[in-house]
Amino acid sequence: MLAAAPSAKPNRALLFGVFGTLFFLTLLLGAQTPPYNDGRQIIDPAENLIYRGSFGIPLAGGSVFYNPRPMFVSLVHVPSVLLRRGLSALFPAADSVIRTLTFHLVPAAILGLTGMLMIRFLLLIGVGVLAASLSTSALAFSTILFVYGRVVWSDILQAAMFWGFFSELVLAAREPGRGGAIKVGVWAGLLINTKYTFVLALPGAALFLALEAWPRLRARGLAALFAWTAVAFLPFVLFILWSNHHRWSDAFSAGYGGVPFQESLFWGLYSLLFSYGKGLFIYNPVLALAMHNHRLPNRYWLAIALVCLPIVLLYAKASDWAGDWSWGPRYLIFIVPVLMVPVAVRLNTWIEKRRYFLVGLFGVLAMTGVGVQLVGAGAYWDHFIRLSQATAFEWLGNPNRAGNYSNKHGAHCDPCYEDLHNHTYTPAFQPIEGNYWLLKHWFKGDRWEACEKDMPWRRYTSLPLASPKAFCSTIEVDWWFMPFRKNYRTAGRILLGFFIIALAGCLRLWVRGCRTCGGKGLAVASPGP
C-alpha cells in the first residue's frame, strides 16, 4: 500500500480551508434553477416534513406519494429547508429567491466535504501538499462533481459517501484496527443510505480488507475487525428497514419498479467511458492521467476492481446506462474521486522530478475540464436536451416507440433509446458543444439568424429547422445572481460581497494550512505479500 511521509499531517486549518474554499466558490458560482425532476423528488419530502410534519407528499384524491430513494438523501436537506423557513418568515416577498439559494447550500457543502476528504487522504498516503492541493482543486472544479454540486440531486451525495467509504477502507487495510473498522462501518452505512445499488460494493470491500489484514491479524483478529465494522454498520441497516416499513409497510420493499438490464455489457461499458454524449473522459478529461499511472501499487487497483467494478458492470448492463436527463455519466460519478488518486500520485512525481512539461499537461487537462463544467453549469442541462429532442424529431421524424421496454408505448419516454439516443450517441447533439453554442450566442446577444448559421447539426443537414428558435430565445445563464438583478439588487450585491470575502478568507486558511502541514515527498511502501 501507500505509506505516509512522516511530515504529511493534514491540520485543521488546511481541512477547514479546503472545505470553505470549495463551499463558498461553489455558492459564488451557484445556480438559480430550482429543483426539477429528481431534485423535486428529493427536496419535496424534506419540505413536507418541515412544513406539514409528514415525509409523504399529498396528492389529489387523498393519496400520498413517497420518494422511492433512501430517506437519507432527503433528510440531509432538512437544515436548508429550516433556514429557508426562517428567512422567508422575515422576508416573505423574497421567498422564491430564498428558496433557490438555500436549496443549493447542502450540495455545495457536500462538494466541500468531498474535497476535504480527498486532500486528507492524499496527505496521509504521502502525496505532497502542492500536488494534493492541485488535485483536490481539479476534483472539485474540473470534473462533473462541480455541476452536481450546484443542483439538488443525490449524485454529489453518492460521490461523497462512496469516497468516504473507499478512502477509509484503504486506510483501514493499511493499518487494521478497531478505529478504522468502525469508520469503515459508518461510511458503509451512510453509503447504502444514498443508493441501494452500492450494496454491491460491500462483498468486494470485505474481501479486500481480509486480504490486506490477514497477514497481520489472522483469523481471530480478522473476526474482531469485521465484528466492529458490523456493529457500526448495523444501525444504518435498521434505519433503512424502518424507513421502508414507514413508507411501504414492508421493511424489505424499496418502492422501485422493475429496471431492465438488456444492454450489451461491452457496449454499455464502452458507452459509459467513451460515448459522444456520456463518456467519462470527455466530461472529466483530467482522469485520462489515471490510466497512465504505474507507480501506484497494485493494491489500490485491486481495491478498485473489487469494490468499484461490480457497480460499473451493473450500470453498463442497464438499458438506462446513460442516466436519463443529466450532465455526463452521472452513474459513474461515484468513481471520479477514486480515479483522482492515481492522478495526484502521478502529478506529485512530476513535481518532485521537475517535469514541468508534464505538470503543464495536467494543467491543460484540468483547465479543459473547468471549461467543460462551466459550459455545463452555464445553462441547465434540460434546456439543450429538450432542444435536441425537438430538433431531432423535426429533422429525422418522431420515432416509433411501440416496441420500447417501458410501459409508455407510443408516448414520450425519458429513459428510452428512441428519445435520448440523439444527444447520447451522435456528435450532432453533443451536450458540451450544444451548451457552448447556446451560451456563446446568449453572451453576444445574437438574434436567431446568427444562431442558426453555426448550429452543431448544420454540419449534417441544410434543412431550415424551426424548433431550436424558441429554445434559443429563452436561454438564460444559470447563475443565482440573475434574479437578484431584477428585484433585489442591493441584497444580491451584499450576498455577492459576502461570498467573495468568505472565499478569500478560506483560501487564505488553505494556504496557511499548506505551509504548516509539510509533506513534500511521496513514500511508496511495498505492495505487501
Model-derived segments and their meaning:
Residues 1-529:
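Membrane-proximal envelope and lipid/glycan-remodeling enzymes
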